[in-house]
């Protein structure tokens, strides 16, 4: 079993990275449960964490607050650890519209999803790696706290094969069917097997290129070979191979029988309650739907939405903590929470959001109460899984600071870039003053971000600047994801010089061309003008050597004082380090596509605006459909189920028309 992490990099730790690494490692070796790394933007936090992982040498779970960030971290860790198992575990849905009921309009929306096969493969690869080795880093989104099948069943049902092992060909085939592999001699792909005489070829669920060829002599395995599934080329000989289940929700036939008995008993109890409350329509609906699911489970071994019966399938009592990816790790694993000021509130809030939606389905007879146990972890359940944890953030939140107030700092950027200079100017005459600043920046081919507090002020300011001849765009919450990507990209390209918005903290706004961030109404205390938000907003100017922040305010609030004090403190440390080491700050040069996940749809922006499908070319039509699919996913993410369902139906119509 491979168990040593090996960090590969042409860089060595610089600035205050060595001290941060040393402190984090010492804390972990001392047995500290919670540690926080306060790392300013662009200081190389991932490299620091990689050094810690190598030094401590334990299986590691790195959690991020969305798929995009998880993808970036996966690429970075893969580069740092090419000889170890760096795995990726995020939701495998490209699009996920959860089952929902809207009582106001009596609208039931069925679950609808499209599964990404590549991500499904990576999820299987991640769980398999945890059973086979210790040098494992799994990069996961918060979806890793959602219910997953039992790791005990998963481990016990794996099929272990060795050369010389006595097992008949037919016994092996039965075992493969039990772990949800399909026989298909023609269309051979992941999660399938094929048979040719005394040779069985198995395509593991965690692979997409190589399969295993098992050769029998009578009732004995004579040879095991790894084969290229496409070309048939022999990759190598194997003495032993483990075939993991093709689904994380594997259920043995004997357990399925018990589960069906328990589901029927729960259904009877629930029907009595509904009828006693005179909810006859709900009772009829529940009886019809559940009996249909039970028939499918008896005949086929599964049904649509089988995860809603997961508590019965694992024979757990009501309310018990569900199994998740965290249960697949060994007891001594360590956790890293990236952007913890965002990720921890997300972990805290996931249970409540999930329960509110499911409770509606239970109340109106769409689901049995046991569906409530197919859920994400509560915060206190998540905490019980923690062995040792490191929080990483430029602005740690109250949760992290409460767990361990002794924060480890990483302030120096390897590029020498400083935190921006912050100025406070009076509100009176702020627009004229802002115009002068914008003109100065435009002359130098630099960009400006302006943040306001209200939608009306953003709109009025944008219109005023447009009339004054400024190339400006307003970025508000109603701007769709694709459009947002285009606007940010166009700011970098110089189509716009200024972006006005309310919340400019969202991902994708770290732009090297931005040398000025203007904060209007900086003295109005609240979420968008809190100390943490102000530090994050000011950080948007930290990628440019001429970075500057102007706060327009008539009084100094505690949030302003603290955020300015923190920025000046960091700046002083950075200047001293640069002077001591002869470093001159230089603006980061980034490829336009490097910072933003630009898509083909963003390249075809004009085509998307054409709504007459009959006049579109195939390429334009494909782009239009892609744009609609993005909008549908965003609507589902925002819990706007009705809008997502409308878009889904419209897409089906368009696709049906050919």
Curated annotation (Swiss-Prot):
Keyword Transmembrane attached: no
Binding locations of ATP: 39-46
GO cellular component: cytoplasm; excinuclease repair complex
Motif (Beta-hairpin): 92-115
Compartments reported by the entry: Cytoplasm
PROSITE patterns for this protein: HELICASE_ATP_BIND_1, HELICASE_CTER, UVR
Keyword DNA-binding: no
Cross-referenced InterPro entries: Helicase/UvrB_N, Helicase_ATP-bd, Helicase_C-like, P-loop_NTPase, UVR_dom, UVR_dom_sf, UvrB, UvrB_inter
Coiled-coil ranges from the UniProt annotation: none
Sorted UniProt keywords: ATP-binding, Cytoplasm, DNA damage, DNA excision, DNA repair, Excision nuclease, Nucleotide-binding, SOS response
Annotated UVR domain residues: 622-658
Span of domain Helicase C-terminal: 430-592
Top-level taxon of the source organism: Bacteria
Ranges where the Helicase ATP-binding domain occurs: 26-414
CDD domains: DEXHc_UvrB, SF2_C_UvrB
GO biological process: nucleotide-excision repair; SOS response
A GO MF term: DNA binding
Location (main, coarse): cytoplasm
Subunit structure: Forms a heterotetramer with UvrA during the search for lesions. Interacts with UvrC in an incision complex.
Function: The UvrABC repair system catalyzes the recognition and processing of DNA lesions. A damage recognition complex composed of 2 UvrA and 2 UvrB subunits scans DNA for abnormalities. Upon binding of the UvrA(2)B(2) complex to a putative damaged site, the DNA wraps around one UvrB monomer. DNA wrap is dependent on ATP binding by UvrB and probably causes local melting of the DNA helix, facilitating insertion of UvrB beta-hairpin between the DNA strands. Then UvrB probes one DNA strand for the presence of a lesion.
Written domain comment of the UniProt record: The beta-hairpin motif is involved in DNA binding.
UniProt similarity note: Belongs to the UvrB family.
Protein name, UniProt field: UvrABC system protein B
Organism of origin: Listeria monocytogenes serotype 4b (strain F2365)
